[in-house]
Amino acid sequence: MSQAVKVERRETLKQKPNTSQLGFGKYFTDYMLSYDYDADKGWHDLKIVPYGPIEISPAAQGVHYGQSVFEGLKAYKRDGEVALFRPEENFKRLNNSLARLEMPQVDEAELLEGLKQLVDIERDWIPEGEGQSLYIRPFVFATEGALGVGASHQYKLLIILSPSGAYYGGETLKPTKIYVEDEYVRAVRGGVGFAKVAGNYAASLLAQTNANKLGYDQVLWLDGVEQKYIEEVGSMNIFFVENGKVITPELNGSILPGITRKSIIELAKNLGYEVEERRVSIDELFESYDKGELTEVFGSGTAAVISPVGTLRYEDREIVINNNETGEITQKLYDVYTGIQNGTLEDKNGWRVVVPKY
């Protein structure tokens, strides 16, 4: 698709926020991308419209039965050039999530073109400070106003944009405290753990709140059958460094196939590190720590990119990783990864997609 997407212009534009106080997900740009689906027409009426409230039926099936999926990616600006980071991977995963919830597939190329035009219109909203970016949230939900469990015949896709501050406030990486959850489970194989569906996040909130009350930042989930194999953290995939080797749980159908995870694996190999994707039990992890072999732990995700783990608690035992300091490999991966994202380091893998001026 190369033709321009229809744009419905606002009469007045918003005042842009102070870029030193952005935080995450607090401010939204002037426009959003909108796309509608019904069983007779398919996807239609792709357009850019003013950001604002939308009207849905009180009986909208997405509200009642949970047909709702989303994605998250970022755009970066440097010296006037705007680039997306691996957006094609997000739209592939979006389609995988849609398929799992019996929702209609989207044309990935068409959607990417629409996103580029939206980001181009909003390029003045993209902050250029250290660690800052434009967060992009595509999401799809069922809108048919009818009760009764079944796949909806109508859907809406929206893409909204939010200028975001540096995750670490422009400071050095800050190790997090992780609580290993051994009562609740996030997902089971054959379920929706591999998909980015809204319900996965709702189901994690109780355990997350309990962990916060105990003084921990996030929850580390174990498998849903034996509750012994490590899967992922609440909003991140998880990595371990043992004797210089980078290890991460293998994808098994209940772990989200993170795009940052995929990129970190490729990057680590390019940098000469040995990488293993395999099952890792929580007992093995603690044994590795006791032997002095576990030297670093970090999470990966769109928001933080890489988040070092300084403290890990399982049952009645708490361990401190690397004296609660960011490890050498963790820091190296973060520096190179973010350098590629923001354009200060060479993009040898072709991950950055430059947004043209239309």
Curated annotation (Swiss-Prot):
Catalysed transformations (reactions): L-leucine + 2-oxoglutarate = 4-methyl-2-oxopentanoate + L-glutamate; L-isoleucine + 2-oxoglutarate = (S)-3-methyl-2-oxopentanoate + L-glutamate; L-valine + 2-oxoglutarate = 3-methyl-2-oxobutanoate + L-glutamate
Taxonomic superkingdom: Bacteria
InterPro entries recorded: Aminotrans_IV, Aminotrans_IV_CS, Aminotransferase-like, B_amino_transII, BCAT-like_C, BCAT-like_N, BCAT_family
Enzyme's top EC category: transferase
Any Pfam family hit: Aminotran_4
Keywords carried by this UniProt record: Amino-acid biosynthesis, Aminotransferase, Branched-chain amino acid biosynthesis, Pyridoxal phosphate, Transferase
GO BP term, example: isoleucine biosynthetic process
Pathway: Amino-acid biosynthesis; L-isoleucine biosynthesis; L-isoleucine from 2-oxobutanoate: step 4/4; Amino-acid biosynthesis; L-leucine biosynthesis; L-leucine from 3-methyl-2-oxobutanoate: step 4/4; Amino-acid biosynthesis; L-valine biosynthesis; L-valine from pyruvate: step 4/4
Residues the record lists as N6-(pyridoxal phosphate)lysine modifications: K196
EC number(s) from the headed UniProt entry: 2.6.1.42
Cofactor(s) this protein cannot do without: pyridoxal 5'-phosphate
Molecular function, one GO term: L-isoleucine-2-oxoglutarate transaminase activity
Family recorded in the similarity comment: Belongs to the class-IV pyridoxal-phosphate-dependent aminotransferase family.
Known role: Acts on leucine, isoleucine and valine.
Name of the protein: Probable branched-chain-amino-acid aminotransferase
Native organism: Staphylococcus aureus (strain Mu50 / ATCC 700699)
